[in-house]
Amino acid sequence: MNDSEFHRLADTLWLTIEERLDNWDGDSDIDCEINGGVLTLSFENGSKIIINRQEPLHQVWLATKQGGYHFDLKGDEWICDRSGATFWDLLEQAATQQAGEAVSFR
């Protein structure tokens, strides 16, 4: 994967998250902000989830209250380089915990 392809895939990931939150109809308020390639989700309780891209490594990084995760693209899924979990699974687990209600991005 070259840099431009990586950025296209990361942009698609960011857009998917933003669109899902725009359509969010849960009781919790989840704000989404993108600034300089960093996507920040802010929750009512003051907690945050930070998602950023690491261009030199062609990775997406996810920082949550539970910890930090690094994802490599394998096939058509972003996969955690330590646990093998998918990006969507870990994001949904963290967002659900931080929002206090079930959050789905799929």
Swiss-Prot record:
The UniProt record lists the keyword Iron: yes
Keywords of this entry: Iron, Metal-binding
One Gene Ontology cellular component annotation held by this UniProt entry: cytosol
Domain of life of the organism encoding this protein: Bacteria
Molecular function GO labels: ferric iron binding; ferrous iron binding
UniProt-listed CDD domains: Frataxin (cd00503)
GO biological process: iron-sulfur cluster assembly
Known function: Involved in iron-sulfur (Fe-S) cluster assembly. May act as a regulator of Fe-S biogenesis.
Family: Belongs to the frataxin family.
Protein name, entry field: Iron-sulfur cluster assembly protein CyaY
